[in-house]
C-alpha cells in the first residue's frame, strides 16, 4: 500500500478513539504542542531538524502507541512505560535519531527494537520500507497488529534478536538501533549498503552516526 493512503486510515482510527473524553481535535492540538516543544529543545544543535521529520511526528498518533492508562500523557515530551519492562522513547529522541539518518523517500530502513511500533511508524511516513525487529515476543505481536490496524503496510515486524540483523532483507540504506548497545553489532554493519547510515543508541554512541564504507 502506498504511504499516501496512510493518513486516511489514521483518520479513521483517530475518529474512533475517545480516550478519557479527549477528542481527535484535542489530541491533534496536543501533538502540535509536542512538536513545538521538540523544536525548542533542538535549538542548541548545529542545525534545525529536517521539516519532513517534524511533519512525520505531527502525523503519527502517539496516544495509540501507549497503554490506555498512559494515553493522557502521550503528548508530553518524555518516555512512557509500554509494558514488559520497556518504554516508548521520548519524542525528542525519536526526532533526533530520525533526523540523523538523513532519510530519502526510497530508502529501506532496519530498526532494532520495535517496542510499541511508534518509531517504526515515524520512519514509515518518510521512507519506502521499514523492517523492525523486537526481541520481546508480546511487544512484537502487539506492534505488528497496531501498525497494520493504522495502515502502515510498508512496515514488516519480526520477532528475534535484533543484533543479528535481518540478512534476508539486507542490504539497508539506514539502520536505527533503538535498543541500547555498548558497541555496534558487526552483523548490522555488514547489512548496511555502501554509504549507508546507522544511528546506534548506547554507551558512547548517543547522538552519533556510523557510516558504511
Model regions and ranges:
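Conserved nucleotide-cofactor-binding alpha/beta core module
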Residues: 102-211
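SAM/dcSAM-binding transferase cores
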Residues: 9, 19-36, 172, 190, ...
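Class I SAM-dependent transferase core
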Residues: 19-110, 121, 126, 141, ...
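Sec-dependent signal peptide recognition
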Residues: 2-10
Amino acid at each position: 500500500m502506498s504511504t499516501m493512503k496512510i493518513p486516511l486510515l489514521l483518520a479513521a482510527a483517530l475518529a474512533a478513539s475517545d480516550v478519557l473524553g479527549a477528542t481527535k481535535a484535542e489530541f491533534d492540538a496536543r501533538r502540535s504542542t509536542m512538536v513545538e516543544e521538540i523544536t525548542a529543545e533542538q535549538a542548541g544543535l548545529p542545525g534545525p531538524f529536517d521539516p519532513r521529520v517534524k511533519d512525520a511526528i505531527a502525523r503519527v498518533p502517539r496516544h495509540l502507541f501507549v497503554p490506555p492508562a498512559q494515553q493522557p500523557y502521550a503528548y508530553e515530551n518524555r518516555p512512557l512505560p509500554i509494558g514488559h519492562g520497556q518504554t516508548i522513547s521520548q519524542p525528542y529522541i525519536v526526532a533526533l535519531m530520525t533526523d540523523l539518518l538523513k532519510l530519502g523517500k526510497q530508502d529501506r530502513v532496519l530498526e532494532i527494537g520495535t517496542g510499541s511500533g511508534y518509531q517504526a511508524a515515524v520512519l514509515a511516513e518518510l521512507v519506502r520500507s521499514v523492517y523492525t525487529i523486537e526481541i520481546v515476543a508480546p511487544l512484537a505481536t502487539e506492534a505488528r497488529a497496531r501498525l497494520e490496524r493504522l495502515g502502515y503496510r510498508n512496515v514488516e515486524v519480526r520477532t528475534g534478536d535484533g543484533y543479528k540483523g535481518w540478512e534476508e532483507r539486507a542490504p539497508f540504506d539506514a539502520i536505527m538501533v533503538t535498543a541500547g548497545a555498548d558497541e555496534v553489532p558487526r552483523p548490522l554493519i555488514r547489512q548496511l549498503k555502501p554509504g549507508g547510515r546507522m544511528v546506534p543508541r548506547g554507551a558512547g554512541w548517543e547522538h552519533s552516526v556510523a557510516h558504511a564504507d
